[in-house]
């Protein structure tokens, strides 16, 4: 039903399509499936060739966070149209509810051909939970958290329903305070191919655990002599984490050129 591996160089159409608003979410949503043994390809909106790919997952980075709401919706429409025929269709949503979520969800839903929208923004492993339709970050409503002060993409509401257009019929919001709770809810939903799945990495984990269309063997863990950590976020928590790494004697911190210009003594 979902296609299968033909040989080492050819697959039928991919199994899972992901429409993402930035590169991080394009990779993050793919990761739980990759850990299950599926392969993923992350690409830009155009051109997307489903015929040439040998991956089970196609994740399209729309790079729409920095766009206007209209352009973000247009990018989501284009990406969804390219992936709409795949068995599983997913739309990433930031777990702190930043970005043009309402516009992108409507655009993707209208283009997807799906009859239902399942919206699950919780990512319990990162402290992002959904309780009574309200999104929390470490117990604080997201619109009252530091994410509401994001200079470019502030979280303007904590109420998940505010992000679903009235034009979308059959939408369901999933509350979850733990990953196990989210997994259980996702597992109970039938006909997954009729659903546009919208959410954060927590939803991806649940889908990979309960709805993975093929049972592949997890890949062997990779080993490395050294570890590269790249911090490219403006979030204060990321800055604190980078500062802690910089203070370790075993770590070498290479700063961005602009920061090196401010402080030439730093590497």
Segments from the language model and where they lie:
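Short, Lys/Arg-enriched N-terminal segments with co-localized hydrophobic residues
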Residues: 1-5
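Residues that scaffold, gate, or flank divalent-cation-dependent active/transport sites
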Residues: 30-38, 46-47
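Cap/lid and interdomain-hinge subdomains that line or gate substrate/regulatory clefts
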Residues: 9-16, 39-43, 56, 69-73, ...
């Amino acid at each position: 039903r979902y296609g299968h591996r033909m040989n080492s160089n050819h697959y039928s159409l991919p199994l899972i399509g992901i429409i993402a608003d930035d590169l991080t979410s394009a990779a993050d949503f793919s990761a739980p499936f990759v850990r299950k043994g599926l392969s993923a390809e992350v690409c830009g909106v155009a051109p997307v060739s489903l015929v040439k790919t040998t991956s089970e997952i196609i994740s399209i980075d729309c790079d729409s966070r920095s766009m206007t709401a209209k352009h973000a919706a247009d990018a989501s429409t284009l990406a969804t149209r390219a992936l709409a025929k795949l068995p599983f269709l997913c739309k990433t949503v930031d777990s702190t509810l930043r970005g043009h979520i309402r516009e992108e969800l409507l655009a993707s839903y209208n283009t997807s051909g799906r009859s239902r929208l399942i919206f699950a923004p919780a990512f319990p492993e990162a402290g992002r939970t959904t309780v009574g339709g309200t999104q929390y970050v470490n117990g604080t409503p997201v619109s009252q958290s530091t994410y509401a002060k994001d200079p470019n993409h502030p979280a303007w509401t904590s109420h998940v329903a505010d992000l679903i257009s009235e034009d979308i019929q059959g939408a369901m919001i999933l509350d979850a305070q733990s990953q196990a709770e989210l997994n259980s809810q996702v597992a109970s939903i039938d006909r997954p191919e009729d659903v546009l799945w919208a959410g954060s990495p927590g939803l991806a984990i649940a889908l990979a655990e309960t709805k993975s269309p093929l049972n592949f063997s997890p890949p062997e863990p990779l080993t490395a002599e050294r570890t590269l950590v790249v911090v490219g976020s403006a979030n204060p928590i990321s800055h604190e984490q980078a500062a802690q790494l910089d203070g370790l004697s075993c770590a070498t911190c290479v700063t961005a050129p602009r920061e090196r210009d401010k402080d030439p003594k730093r590497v």
